[in-house]
Amino acid sequence: MRLPRIVVAGAGMAGLVTAVAAQESGAEVVLLEKGPAPGGSLALSGGTLWCARTVDDLRRLVPRGDVELGRVLVEDFPAGVEWLVALGVSLAPLKTLPDRTVYLMEPGPGAFITHMAERFQSGGGTLLCNSAATELLWSDEGEVSGVCVRINGEARQSIACDRVILTTGGFQANPEMLSRYFGRWSDRLILRSNPRSTGDGWQMAQALNAAPSRAMGSFYGHLLPAPPAQVPTHDFIAYTQYHSEQGVLVNLRGERFTDESLGDETNTQAVARQPEALAVLLYDDTVYRTYAVRLAGGGARASDTFYESQALGAPAAVACSLEELAAAMQAHDLHGSSLLATLREYNQAVQDQRTAGLVIPRRANPNPVSKPPFYALGVTPGITFTLGGLRINTDGQVLDRGGYPIPGLYAAGADAGGIHNERYAGGLCLGLVFGRRAAKHAASH
């Protein structure tokens, strides 16, 4: 009996997992990587692998995500972690919170990438770098029969196969698609991931009438210091404003526009919809010392996210009074009088314990901006990966616009969308769980 031949397009987290899992399931596997080496956006991450602890936890964290895909994500995650450990991957339990379980790749994502790539190749797999999948081939029998590949940006060749699994990493580096789904200010988004994630999987699948998932207008990312600051691509984590949920965000009019306590990834999407995709993050000395100054840990270096961002050139001010802070930020095109009124109204609501009743409610973390000195930092969205993509079923099969599986076509990782929507509960877990599921189904059907 001939072994099934599977082509996996993209060698990031999802692609590496998929390729090794398909190989273990008895398939002959070719793994394509658009760049010069495997890794994708995983290589730029901190290597944190996490997921919601229970299905109920996931529903609270991501209430608008796909229910059935979310259930599979949570239920399969522990087995995926056990599988990685059995392969020899070093995962350290980083912390266990009431609603999530977190692991850290040790000594970092680079070791994971090397280990998985070597495991794949030593098992007889073919890894082709500088090889971008550009087109899916379709047989007379009505199923995927191969893929066209551009090698080194020039030569093209076709690879015949029985199944194709798309793991190209989303479309966050595709300006046209960002404009289509994220609107007027999408060109201001700072790419904090793989620059080769240009929606290749999405575009190839559209030729086969593939359906879009939900969440096409959502992305996962974090706030970064605003221009003229330019964050070094190797050091995104040190400058990321994870603590925005502890502060107050205002737009250039000096007005709040979102419930900051929903989380930095939600704040990032909200800022992307504001004029110029710019906002100012405000907090007092208590928040600065507790959250803005970070110790080394979780794969990241120690950093002072305010002063290091200011040193890069981001609009910023420190003052001993709110009046002085508002006046200082006027030099950065912020409406100072509106900012002052916003902060006074907010502080009064905190004092009266009625922040949930503000025009823009604040439901958690009602930290007052009351202890000097006070800090203001211009911020802008950084995009890591898109939450929308191809619609899949629980086996990772790509569905057409009628809701039927496209024979021979699968997707995992950021190419498969709708699992998260607006909010987020782990990124690498998507590649782990649905990469394994797609591999198993593709190798056995």
Regions found by a protein language model. Name each.
Residues 2-4, 153-163:
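Core beta-strand elements of the Rossmann-like FAD/NAD(P) dinucleotide-binding domain
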Residues 4-31:
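N-terminal Rossmann-like FAD-binding beta1-loop-alpha1 element of flavoenzymes
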Residues 12-13, 36-37, 343:
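Residue-level detector of alpha-helix initiation sites
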Residues 27, 34-126, 131-135, 249-250, ...:
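Conserved N-terminal/central alpha/beta ligand/cofactor-binding core
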Residues 135, 338-419:
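A glycine-rich dinucleotide-binding beta-alpha-beta segment and adjacent secondary-structure elements
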Residues 159-228, 428:
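Glycine-rich loop(s) and the adjacent beta-strand/alpha-helix scaffold that form part
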Residues 202-204, 211-334:
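An anion/pyrophosphate-binding glycine-rich loop and adjacent beta-alpha core
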Residues 204-211, 431-445:
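Internal hydrophobic alpha-helix adjacent to the cofactor/substrate pocket in enzyme cavities
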